[in-house]
Amino acid sequence: MKQNIKRNWIWILIVMIVIGIILYFSIRNLFSTKVAEWSISELLNNIERAKENTTDALYFKEITVNPFTNSITGVFNNTDNTSTSFVTYTNLDLLRLSGVASDQGVISKIFTPEVFLTANNVSGSLKSVATPQPNPFLGILISSVPVLILIFVMVWIYRSQVKMMNGQGGAFGGDKGTAQIIKSDKKFTDIAGNKEPIEEISEVVDYLKNPGKYQQSGARMPHGILLGGPPGTGKTLLAKATAGEANVPFYFVSASSFVELFVGMGAKRVRQVISEARKNSPAIIFIDELDAIGRTRGSGIGGGHDEREQTLNQLLVEMDGMKENSGLLFIAATNRTDVLDPALIRPGRFDRIITVGLPDVKEREEILKLHAKGKRFESNVDFANIAKRTPGFSGAQLENVINEAVLLSIREDTKVINLYQIDEAIDRVMSGPAKKSRTITKEELTMVAYHEAGHAVVGIKVPGGNKVQKITIIPRGNAGGYNLMMPENEKYNYSKADLYATIASFMGGRAAEEIIYGDNKISTGAADDIKKATSIARRMVTQFGMSDLGPIEYQSDEGSPFLGKALASNSSLSNQVNHEIELEIRKIIFTAKEQATKIIKQNIELLELIKESLLKKETIVGEEIEYIAKHMKLPPEKIEEKDLSKNSEDNNLDSLIEKTSKKE
């Protein structure tokens, strides 16, 4: 492809140079001085008239006698202070005159009829030779050159477009195909977590290596495997590991590369990729971001006649049509399995749909240890505790945490990575870097401290609420403060009480502001808390059936995948039902907020202590919060960082404080 592009640019450069030369000479001839064609008699007569009116004998500005073409050219000084360019052709021998033509002092003696006749031994009068006429065919040819060049360029561009549409490259890029044969050094052993997806794919890879073992039992290989799940969970990494494990050609293609400018290109490229893979079967075709072409048909603005749907139709035919795909395995990855066309995910096309979900606490520990290989950490770094502090993190985020910690270690010039750097790396991944240089007034800082302390108090006192593991009043991202709230244990199912407790934890910040400053002085700092609390309450009413409206789903998930939920929502709910839903959401939020307000009023002293600790240290962790709640006093300042960061499951902070006090 690069050679084609280079060759195209060379031709473009040549054409531009030729056109430039033609334009240069055309403009030069257009603006050049008009040349008078004089016969010898006219030339001599002009010289005689100049003799009568001129005394300095400077008749010419310039003059050239060319004996090879028998021509005289020059610029003649007229008597009216003007000049005339002339040319004279003759059959006389001008060789003797060429040597003295530049000496204007003798021109008056040379350019006389007698001299011309004597010098050439010609008797009689002087005769002029007709001016040479150019070849008419040559003139037509020269005038046709620009038109021919223009036609050539147009034909060349047209052929380039045709080549590109045929997949052979062209003036606008294009390539022979969109698939790349990948050779990966990744193995399944290089992946931490995702045990179930690895087992499913390993079975298919084994089928490709040992087809006889399965054929004896009458089993057929799955036509396709669809990997779905949130971003960053390792779907593409699984595909790379599959390429490294399988000893068969592995074709990688992005779904978006099928659809381009020209109509029909997508379907053609699908045929090209699959045809090439069939020639080298058994083979694997991996399609990344399948939702780019696999969305439900007939829902878009263009109906069923757009390029994307033609491409999808071709893919459906190639995967399970009249042609057999023996030895050909399709693997695809997407974050949006919910918007895929039903015909694409039926058995016979993508037989297996594997969800690659977010890792649990044990898998997070394995992922952290995998990415920590080759890096130096302090001895007190416990990856199990780090895994507990990062619920909901994907594999990509965990890798980024380790990388950020390494970068912080280099920035601070420490030879090993310590707990503080890992802690800061987690915060950077979640909320961005701290903005320590931002100027904040003391009043605003105090309000932020009360807000964050309110979250902590409610989390401590409400059973099932989110526990605050870390609080800081140092701005991060767009937030004035930051708190890390996590449930005590990771759950997959939540009770109604758990959700109420979670909403109450979110409303703790706003409740603290109202208690301390009053309704008229509340701030915008609770915006994100309100958004999250409202989202949970809405799902409790419309999806989970946890309200007085009963166990009914009031929210349909059949919106258009193209126009979005808002534009394409065809709600079948009446205005009265929507009003009742809003009332139930309001009831849940207000109930949780009243609970948070009541708890904070009952524990106002704890709120003040946590606020004072925040203003004093700017950042406090879960162990310090627990100590304050248990002893109702601020923890000592000189607590060793390695002790403070240990796991608090056994609530051993009291003994650490006692040890620290004894050291003092």
UniProtKB/Swiss-Prot annotation:
It is found in: Cell membrane. Its EC number is 3.4.24.-. Residues 639-649 have a biased composition (Basic and acidic residues). It comes from Mycoplasmopsis synoviae (strain 53). Residues 639-664 are annotated as: Disordered. Zn(2+) binds at H451, H455, D529. This is ATP-dependent zinc metalloprotease FtsH. Its cofactor is Zn(2+). ATP binds at G229, P230, P231, G232, T233, G234, K235, T236. The chain crosses the membrane at residues 10-30, 137-157. The active site is at E452. Residues 1-9, 158-664 are cytoplasmic. InterPro entries: AAA+_ATPase, AAA_lid_3, ATPase_AAA_core, FtsH, P-loop_NTPase, Peptidase_M41, Peptidase_M41-like. Keywords: ATP-binding, Cell membrane, Hydrolase, Membrane, Metal-binding, Metalloprotease, Nucleotide-binding, Protease, Transmembrane, Transmembrane helix, Zinc. It is an enzyme of class 3 (hydrolase). Residues 31-136 are extracellular. Pfam families: AAA (PF00004), AAA_lid_3 (PF17862), Peptidase_M41 (PF01434). GO terms for biological process: protein catabolic process; proteolysis. Its main location: membrane. Homohexamer. Disulfide bonds: none annotated.
